[in-house]
Each structure stands twice: as structure tokens, then as C-alpha cells.
């Protein structure tokens, strides 16, 4: 397909190229931090993320709670703020500018200490092999 000039769209790679071009990634997983979302289930229950549709993260229910109440609970939960916690090793990694630590669900905290992304070694292997090519693609897109 690629050789016939019909390039596939692969969100993760498109976001990497965009990051290298100075754009903000559209995928929250590639931002390295969570955003404010309202995931609404069929029963009206609201959660901060589609990967955290769990009782402990339920912010309320649209049938019972106002948006103001739900937003207040989100702030009180510290859900988004917790996603800013990265290990010092992660922040110092040569690939942090493009990896950004990945999704919070892949680096859950243990106690007070931020967790390491369990795909970290894989990301390093990938970027060791592919970052030069991604940079070439980004440069060619900016021409």
C-alpha cells in the first residue's frame, strides 16, 4: 500500500511526526498527561477516562448530579494532576520529548512514588531504531 502512494493513517506514528514538527499530539496517550473528559456510560455514570470506568473513579451520574458537582469531584479526586507524576529517570530520558511518559494507565503509582511505564524498554528500542526516520519524515513534511 505504501509503495503505491496510498499511505496508511496510523494515529501513533502520525502523532510522533506531529510532535517532531512542534504540534501538540491529539492522542491523550501521547501527551503524557490526562485531559479533562467526561466519559458517560449508558446508565448516566460519569468517569474521568474510558480506561478508568471503575467504581473508585466514578464522578457521579447525570441523572442525579449537576455538571458542577461532577466537576468538583473530578478536581477533588486529583485524577488529572496525578498524571503529571513521572519518575526522574523518565523525565531525564533522551526520548521523553517524544514519548512523554505515555498513558497514566501504563505507569500507575505505587504509594507516593510515580511508576515507570511498563512499555518503557519497548519505547526505547523503537525510538533507537526509528527516531531518525521519523525525524526525516517530519522534515520532509515541513518543506
List each language-model region with its residue ranges.
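Short, small/polar residue-rich loop motifs at catalytic or cofactor-binding pockets
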Residues: 31-34
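Short, acidic, Ser/Thr-enriched surface-loop or helix-capping motifs
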Residues: 41
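Histidine/acidic-rich helix-loop-helix segments that form or flank divalent-metal centers
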Residues: 25
Amino acid at each position: 500500500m505504501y509503495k503505491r502512494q496510498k499511505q496508511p493513517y496510523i494515529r501513533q506514528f502520525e502523532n510522533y511526526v506531529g510532535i517532531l514538527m512542534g504540534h501538540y499530539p491529539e492522542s491523550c496517550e501521547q501527551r503524557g498527561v490526562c485531559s479533562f473528559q467526561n466519559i458517560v456510560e449508558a446508565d448516566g455514570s460519569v468517569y474521568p477516562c474510558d480506561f478508568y470506568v471503575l467504581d473508585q473513579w466514578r464522578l457521579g451520574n447525570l441523572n442525579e448530579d449537576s455538571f458542577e458537582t461532577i466537576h468538583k469531584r473530578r478536581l477533588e479526586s486529583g485524577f488529572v494532576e496525578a498524571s503529571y507524576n513521572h519518575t526522574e529517570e523518565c523525565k531525564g530520558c533522551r526520548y521523553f520529548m517524544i514519548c512523554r511518559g505515555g498513558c497514566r494507565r501504563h505507569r500507575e503509582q505505587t504509594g507516593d512514588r510515580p511508576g515507570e511505564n511498563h512499555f518503557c524498554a519497548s519505547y526505547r528500542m523503537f525510538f533507537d531504531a526509528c527516531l531518525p526516520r521519523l525525524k526525516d519524515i517530519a522534515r520532509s513534511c515541513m518543506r
